[in-house]
Every structure is written in C-alpha cells, then in structure tokens.
Amino acid sequence: MNKLISILVPCYQSQPFLDRFFKSLLKQDWNGVKVIFFNDNKPDPTYEILKQFQQAHPQLAIEVHCGEKNVGVGGSRDQLINYVDTPYFYFVDPDDEFSDPNCFKAIVETIQGENFDIAVLNSIVYLQMLKNDFLIKHIPLKNIFQGKVKLNPDNTVNHLHYIQNNDQYIWNIVINTAFFKALDLQFVNRFIEDIAVWFPIMFKAQKVLWIDVNGVNYYLRPNSASTQKNSIKLLSFIEAYERLYFHLKKVGKLADFIDPNNKIESRFWRRQAFIWFSFINVSWMKAEFEQTKSVLQKLFDFMEANGIYDRVFTNKHHGIYLLWVNRLKHFKKLVQAQPHL
C-alpha cells in the first residue's frame, strides 16, 4: 500500500522517553504509514538512538533527520512538514505515546474512506504533578484538552463547536497536507507554538471528521517545557499571540475569531489570564521588576493595539476565571501607574 500518512515526531533531548515511545509505535499496524523523526540539533544521544531504531526495523518506513542548528520546537515542526510527501500528517511528541494499538489502522481506514481537511481523535492527558513536586502517575483526564466533539447530521464534526470547546494543541489531529500547505502557515519557535496554527486551520477547514479512537497519551510533566515559568517563556507567549492574529488576518478568519457571539476570543484570553497570572505575583515582580514590567507592558500594548482588552476584559462575566482576570487588571494598573515598586 502507498503511504497515506506521515507521523511527525519533533525531538529535542528526548532520550529518557524514547523507549516508551518506540514500544507504542511497534504495537501499531504500519500499513500505509511512515514515521518521520527530526532531531533539533543537540549534542546528546537522541539522534543515535533514533538511527538505531531505524536500523533495527528496516521493514518499517522510518525517516530520521537532524538539523544543522537548533531551530526550536516550532522550527522543527515546520521542517517536518517540509519532509511530508503523503496526503496526510499527524504530530506526536516523543515524551508522549500512542494509547490504542488500533490508532494507525483507524486513521488509515478513515483516509481510505473519504477525503477531509482535518480529523480529530480522542485523547487522554495524564497529570504527573501536584504541589510540592509530589508526582502522580497515570491519573487520566480523558478528552479534557481535546476530544469534546459535537457531530452534524452528516456525521462531520461541528467545527465551530470544536473550536469553542477544545484547547489548541497540534497533536491528536490528522491534517490534510495539501490543505495545510495552501494556507502557508508557520509555527513560532518556542512555547505555545500550536495556537498560531491551530485556530486558522480549524476555522478554514471545510470538512472535519471524528475518528473514535484514543490517539495520544499526553503526559504533563513538572519539568516539561509546557510547565516552565520564566520571563523568556512569557515573551514567547506574546510572539505566539502576534503570529496568531497575523495568521487569522492572513486566512480571512479574524472576524470569526473576535465575533462576540462565538465567544472564542474571550474564552481564549481568559485562559491566557489563568496561564499568566496563576504564577505571577507581587513578590516575583518586586524581585525582577524592571524585567517583569517590560514583559507585562509588552503584553498590554499588544492587547490595546488589537482591541483585545476592551473586547474581553471590560465586561463582568468571567466565570471560573474571575480571579485570574482580576489579577490581570490589577497588574495592568500597577505596571502603568508605578515607575518602580
């Protein structure tokens, strides 16, 4: 069978997780599937381990590439897409794993059945942390981040409902290669690189299917990139916001994103308020005030320039995010009113 889908795996210092990931790959039916690894240039054993896996399984369609310089997770995703020569592709990170041994087979059968822009799968997120660094293993939250699906009468996914009710992760979705490349989108190079691509492709997709199979087990670890907290990370968030609004304008979907009737922009920014202000506090600001003030001012300038603050944060209806929205408002006043603390 011709290869129908490429499984894209961006790697960076991935050695501790590869054995588990490889085992989950080897449980799958590879008929119609190729797997492409890209090692983001780093002097650790990851690349050699990937090559060993490739050489140990010559019967499988495995490609292993290594960058000449470090390009970040977004650059790695862009590079992986450049390698794709199959009709569809699917991202997975090497510190996660495939949950259901029938995942590949279900994806291939769906592709064989009909053409589509995007297909979404079920997911399970495993929380591996609580306060005080107490590790919890295998606490499953099924379909919390992705997988909340409402079907139309023709059994396609109501993609507006999906956008409204799911978080913006590029993993666990099957993407039509020609559809994606026609949009000419690029990932940002650091944190939350997904959002600048996820919203535009979801808005532009004409046909979205649901594949009723568990795809990725997503492991949220205390020392992973997604849980790190520092000013560099916050600046990369702003870069991602800028790219998101640029991409939405580019594909002609900004109006849908900010439409108050859709409640998409407001939900997105309330969640961002939680991410920012659940761990920023006054004592941290006092310790690093000049740096912190500069970062926060950049955030608020972006909000003002794009009308976000007035659209989202001037009403009183913020639900469970009220605490974090109020903290955002507090810091906005603090940064703009005081030259020093």
UniProtKB/Swiss-Prot annotation:
Gene Ontology terms, MF aspect: 1,2-diacylglycerol 3-beta-galactosyltransferase activity
Cofactor: Mg(2+)
Subcellular location per the Swiss-Prot or TrEMBL entry: Cell membrane
Other comments on record: The local lipid environment around the enzyme affects both the extent of head group elongation and total amounts of glycolipids produced.
Keywords: Carbohydrate metabolism, Cell membrane, Glycerol metabolism, Glycosyltransferase, Lipid biosynthesis, Lipid metabolism, Magnesium, Membrane, Transferase
First-listed, main subcellular location of the protein, grouped into a coarse class: membrane
Record carries keyword DNA damage: no
Name by which UniProt lists this protein: Processive diacylglycerol beta-glycosyltransferase
Catalysis performed (reactions): a 1,2-diacyl-sn-glycerol + UDP-alpha-D-glucose = a 1,2-diacyl-3-O-(beta-D-glucopyranosyl)-sn-glycerol + UDP + H(+); a 1,2-diacyl-sn-glycerol + UDP-alpha-D-galactose = a 1,2-diacyl-3-O-(beta-D-galactosyl)-sn-glycerol + UDP + H(+); a 1,2-diacyl-3-O-(beta-D-galactosyl)-sn-glycerol + UDP-alpha-D-glucose = a 1,2-diacyl-3-O-[beta-D-glucopyranosyl-(1->6)-beta-D-galactopyranosyl]-sn-glycerol + UDP + H(+); a 1,2-diacyl-3-O-(beta-D-galactosyl)-sn-glycerol + UDP-alpha-D-galactose = a 1,2-diacyl-3-O-[beta-D-galactosyl-(1->6)-beta-D-galactosyl]-sn-glycerol + UDP + H(+)
Activity regulation summary: Activated by the negatively charged lipid phosphatidylglycerol (PG).
Keyword Transcription regulation: no
GO cellular component: a single term: plasma membrane
